[in-house]
Structure formats: structure tokens, C-alpha cells
């Protein structure tokens, strides 16, 4: 029977420190200085005196490695806990389309909710009260940002337009608005703004129709001037309007290069439409200037055509009525009048002057006298 000897680590009991007589005489500090060296020598001597077996050394080495591994495993345990904490963070709430529609409708009716209404909406939509509260906060912030962005876009678009173009459009609008005023007030304001109208090259002045000439001759025959003074200044006013029309048309031809997408149909009432478009363009002239100017241009062209037709028609009719072939008739021939436009400064004064000149002619004298003889 072979005897196997097992070596176990030897546990040495620490012996109590020996108090010497010198320590009592010289004090505690002297013994304290000597005690660590004596204990250190004692432990070194005891460890060196006991020879260790190789198996014991291997056992101690494995135990030391296990302790190191356990300490190394404990080190990354803290980041893993942090990752778990990050994963436990609240995820973003994904609202369904039905919930979003209900919340938007509630926001349109009321931007701020009191607590009872918030709880009611949360229960109806199967949401938390906090989720409803946060959604309304975010929606209010988005609403404010949209308003600020819209204002900034308007301001930037207005600043981007050149100052000269803005002043030119304002001048056009003021002219169009002045056409819808009374002709005497418009003429007075034009004379105040432009005192040197006679020096500037104007359109050729149209000669007075034969009706006005005949009226003046009959008035001199009776020795009375019955024609109102508005009949003669109306021609100057019309020439001024025609010159302003030509200037505006030239400016519009230069400023509008691309054709407009929307065209306003020309109608009989041309003056009020021009005034209304001028007022609307004065409010929003910095955005759709091209469209507004194109429509104004077409309205002005239609107005000029109507004005020229209304002026040329009665002249031809009067020339035919005063022809020598119609001397034998005892009654005044019928004169075809064009339908006057709604604009006072373009059509009405000329029409009124023609009516006045015809009404003051004595039918007996007109039928009995032959001016050629």
C-alpha cells in the first residue's frame, strides 16, 4: 500500500507581538519603528523555510488567473448596463391615420386643451394623456414656424423686386385710377402734376366734328352762345387720355414679354374694370405682375378701339346728314349715336357735347337755309 501525501497550504497563525523591556523604557515610537522589520523578517523566513510542491504552485497560478478573468468580466458589465438603459428609452409614438385626423380636427377648433378635454380625447383615441399633450405642443410649434416662414417668403419676394419696377407699376396704377374719376378733376390733377404738357410731344389733336361747327354758326346767327364750355375742353381731355394710353401701352409692351396664362374678357364697361384691376395690382403687384399687366394691356387696347369707333361713327353720320343732297328735307336727319361707355373721361363728355350741339340747332333754320348758296 503506497502512501500518497497531499500537500495543503499551511496557515501560520500570527503570533502576538512580544513586548520588550526596552520598549517600555524608550517609548512606543521606538517599538513601532522596529516592529515592521521584525515581522517582515519573520514572514520571509517562514515562507522560505517551507518548500512548495509544483502542483501547489500550479494550483495557485490557476486560481490567480481565474481571479483576473472574473475581474476582467466585471469591467464591461457597466457598459452593458448602460446599453440596457439606452434601450429602455421611450420610443417615438406612431399615430395612426384615424388618430391624426381626430387630433387635427380638434386642433383646428381649439389649439389649447384643458385637462378634462385632453383626458377625453386620450380615452377616445386609446392614447395616453401625455401623448396628446406632447402632440399639441409640437403642432403649435409647427403652426408658428409655418406662419413665420410665410411672412419671411413674402418679405424676401418684395425686396427682390427692383425699386424702379415698383415705382413704374405704381405710376401705371395711379393713371388707371385717375381715368375712373371725374374728367375735370382728372384734368386738374394732371395739370398740377405735369405743368409742361404743352411742351411735350402729344398726340395729334382731332378736329372738331361738323356738328360742333354748325352749332357755333347757328349760335352766332342768333347772337347767343348756348353751348356749354365743356364741349371744347373735352377734345383736349380726350387727346390727353390718348397720349396717356399710348405711353401706357408702350410701357406694357416693354415690361410684358411672356404671354399671360389668364386673360380677362373685354366688355362694354372698360373704365371700372381697369380701375379695379389697378387697385388689385397695387395690393399684390409684387407677385403676379406679368399676369395683371397683360390683362390691363388687353383692356386698354379694347378701350382704345371702342373709343375710336365711338368717335368715328358720329362724324361720318353727321357728314352724310349735312350733304347738299339732303337739303330739301324739312326735318333733321337721324344721327346714329354709338353706345357710350361707362368711363366718364373717355366716352361721356364727347357724347354729351354732341347731344347738346344737336339739341340747340333750330330745325326750321337747318331745313330752310342753304349754306352753299
Swiss-Prot record:
Main location: nucleus
Region named Disordered: 41-89
TM ranges: none
Protein name per its UniProtKB record: Protein zerknuellt
Gene designation: zen
SUPFAM superfamilies for the chain: Homeodomain-like (SSF46689)
Entry function: Required for the differentiation of the dorsal-ventral pattern, and does not appear to be involved in the process of segmentation.
UniProt cross-references to Pfam families, sorted A to Z: Homeodomain
